Amino acid sequence: MDTLAVVIEGPERLALNRLSLQSPASDDVLVDVEWSGISTGTERLLWSGRMPNFPGMGYPLVPGYESVGRVRAVGSKVSSHRVGDRVFVPGARCFGEVRGLFGGAASQLVVPAQRVLGIDESLAERGVLLALAATAYHALAASGARPPDLIVGHGVLGRLLARLTLAMGGDAPTVWERDARRRDDSAGYLVVAPEDDTRRDYRSIYDVSGDAHILDAAIARLAMGGEVVLAGFYVEPLSFVFAPAFMREARIRIAAEWKDSDLHAVLEHVQSGRLSLDGLITHRHDADAAGTAYRQAFGDADCLKMILDWRYTA
């Protein structure tokens, strides 16, 4: 059994290759992937070669942790899913010697049944956004967390963070965005250029820009006892001038990757209608054009979210 997969062979070297697919175990499901998302955070770092080293890191690798597909087969011990179910798959490790980091960008996947999440038919391609929504929710739902007064960055993660803040009953945040082309789609909240914002009393600032130099700018806008939440991923070391942080008794919190409970929580928000995933997927390519899709996803500022369509890939 084999599968067609996106393989990052090395920095800025990407191919669409046939790979051996491990045989499903009794507690696995086999999924025919319909769509997979391209992450402009994690996957950009893997593609560019800038991802910091961690256990299991190395090339070649299959990227992707945002896949939606249908269950083709279930193992003998699987009762949670049925053939034909539409599911969200947060990646897979089923390619033999080729690493899955995180292994979702392929036409077929073998995954433990407990790892996949059944989703409503109507979600369709928008289901790929559940991982990013869970990332935003994880930052918001931490013990003692304040909802953001200010969000830095109006990409997909920033938009989901703003939408979730409203969905969870918070006040409308302000959002900073330097790129004028991204100061749109702000239903219910204000998006401004940082230089046009005069406030210096924010209690809670969430950064999702990934800008390693954000701390001084953010701390300067905090109220006394305010908090900066680092919810992006930062390749370069972060630092800040101590005196302004000292004067404000500033706090800095780091939000890590989402957990299964976050994924289930955001799905409930979506299914109840409190959270919309509409208008966030802006670009699509057939999986056969993966090389073009990845370059556009990482190089075109008008591309908020790129997905690959695997349905017609031979």
Regions found by a protein language model. Give the residues of each.
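Short, well-ordered coil/turn residues at beta-beta hairpins
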Residues: W35, P90, Y206-V208, W310
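Glycine-rich phosphate-binding loop and adjacent beta-alpha segment
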Residues: A212-S272, W310-A314
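A short acidic, Gly/Pro-enriched loop at the edge of an enzyme's catalytic core
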Residues: D197-I205
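Mid-domain Rossmann-like dinucleotide-binding core that forms the NAD(H)/NADP(H) cofactor-binding site
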Residues: L123-D196
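NAD(P)H dinucleotide-binding glycine-rich loop of Rossmann-like/cofactor-binding domains
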Residues: S80, V87-V152
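N-terminal Rossmann-fold cofactor-binding loop
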Residues: W176-D179, V208, A256
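Glycine-rich beta-strand-centered segment in the early N-terminal region that forms part
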Residues: Q22-I38, R50-R93, S122-A124
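C-terminal hydrophobic helical "lid"/dimerization subdomain
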Residues: M1, D216, D260-A314
